[in-house]
């Protein structure tokens, strides 16, 4: 059964939605599913741009055959070989054995590492600055290494301004019949998923993304066709601006995240006191997160959004409570930087988590750590009030800086 949509007069979306997968990359929850996008250009020569995960393989192949009709598939253009986009390549090769593959040298190498039977003469290796003409359409190739795999490239159709952006500009969430970003309320329905996708999948590679954005800024882009999520044909500066913030690690907006690690509720109670005092001072853009029950991908995503972070952790085995430690390791791995941070520690006989959390933050780039800290012994009491008030004042002063 065919279920494809037109992007332009001769370009079709031939992907599929997956509502069954619960964990993207077997780690990130996707409660609203995910789309695997592929595109088919019907020029004098036919060009399939990327394939799809095998979970939607049947729908994808039906769509390709539905658009092709009685025509042959001439070219398979591969921008990115991660299995969620490359898994259907063997079936494409079985159905159209004479198809010519256009991709990078490194992509061809990785495909063979995955066991794909690709003949050397079948591959047309391209690199930065190359282009290929398929009739009316000419597609130019731009290298995008480590966005977010080393073989990645993006492709630009110079005829109608279509950027095939691989995993850049993608998003979690199934399309559910929609195709274009202007068919949804993106700010309300999609932005959080797009941010969570970028920050957790691509977030480590901000400098590389900035290089791609710099190249993209010179192109007359009219459409952005990513491998996940909606196609952009309007408000393209909006999503480019979001990517500039995320890739440069600049907060989107001012806000204070209070992430707490609490075994029996005492550190949580202190975090709630802090939140109340901040709100009483007018800082209502304040959010609390239990690091033990909030999936890491949501914490990472919101920290790319907000400007301030308070870490409140109980001491555990003379160290940082393990889920909090894992959170800090993820922040370091994803290269998060340019945030203002504060520390609240707790411990019944040897509170030590504060110094250890501070040491981890100091290893990160451009992190401002406020001098005011709160150290609790077992539970928050009146003797902690003055230190907490000092911390609140420091956070308010930092928050209100221009």
Sequence positions of predicted segments:
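Conserved beta-strand hairpin/beta-sheet module of binuclear metal-dependent hydrolase folds
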Residues: 4-65, 154-157, 161-165, 267
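Active-site neighborhood of phospho(di)ester-bond hydrolases with catalytic His/Asp-centered motifs
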Residues: 49-51, 73-81, 101-104, 163-167, ...
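FMN-binding flavodoxin-like domain, especially the glycine-rich phosphate-binding loop
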Residues: 175, 186-224, 229-231, 273-289, ...
């Amino acid at each position: 059964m065919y279920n494809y949509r037109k992007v332009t007069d001769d370009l079709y979306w031939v992907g599929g939605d997956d509502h069954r997968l619960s964990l993207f990359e077997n780690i990130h929850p996707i409660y609203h599913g995910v789309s695997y996008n592929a595109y088919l250009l019907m020029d004098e020569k036919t060009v399939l741009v990327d394939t799809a995960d095998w979970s939607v393989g049947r729908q994808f192949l039906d769509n390709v055959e539905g658009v092709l009709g009685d025509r042959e598939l001439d070219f398979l253009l591969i921008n990115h070989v991660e299995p969620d986009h490359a898994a259907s390549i063997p079936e494409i090769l079985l159905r159209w054995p004479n198809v010519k593959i256009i991709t990078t040298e490194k992509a061809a190498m990785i495909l063979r590492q995955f066991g794909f039977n690709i003949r050397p003469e079948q591959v047309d290796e391209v690199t930065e600055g190359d282009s290929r003409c398929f009739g009316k359409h000419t597609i130019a190739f731009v290298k995008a290494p480590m966005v977010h795999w080393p073989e990645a490239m993006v492709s630009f159709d110079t005829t109608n301004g279509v950027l095939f952006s691989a995993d850049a500009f993608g998003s979690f969430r199934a399309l559910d019949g929609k195709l274009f970003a202007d068919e949804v309320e993106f700010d309300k329905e999609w932005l959080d998923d797009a941010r969570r996708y970028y920050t957790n999948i691509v977030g480590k590679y901000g400098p590389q993304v900035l290089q791609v954005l710099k190249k993209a800024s010179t192109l007359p882009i009219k459409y952005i066709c990513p491998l996940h999520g909606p196609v952009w044909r309007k408000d393209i500066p909006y999503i480019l601006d979001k990517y500039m913030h995320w890739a440069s690690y600049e907060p989107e907006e001012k806000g204070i995240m209070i992430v707490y690690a609490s075994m029996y509720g005492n550190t949580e109670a202190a975090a709630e006191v802090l939140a109340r005092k901040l709100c009483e001072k007018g800082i209502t853009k304040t959010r609390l997160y239990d690091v033990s029950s909030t999936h890491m991908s949501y914490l990472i995503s919101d920290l790319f959004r907000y400007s301030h972070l308070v870490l409140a952790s109980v001491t555990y085995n003379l160290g940082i409570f393990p889920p909090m430690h894992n959170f800090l390791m993820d922040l370091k791995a994803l290269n998060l930087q340019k945030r203002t941070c504060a520390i609240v520690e707790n411990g019944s006989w040897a509170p030590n988590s504060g110094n250890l959390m501070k040491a981890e933050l100091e290893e990160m780039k451009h992190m401002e750590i406020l001098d005011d800290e709160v150290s609790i012994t077992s539970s928050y009491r009146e003797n902690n009030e003055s230190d907490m008030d000092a911390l609140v004042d420091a956070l308010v002063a930092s928050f209100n800086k221009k």
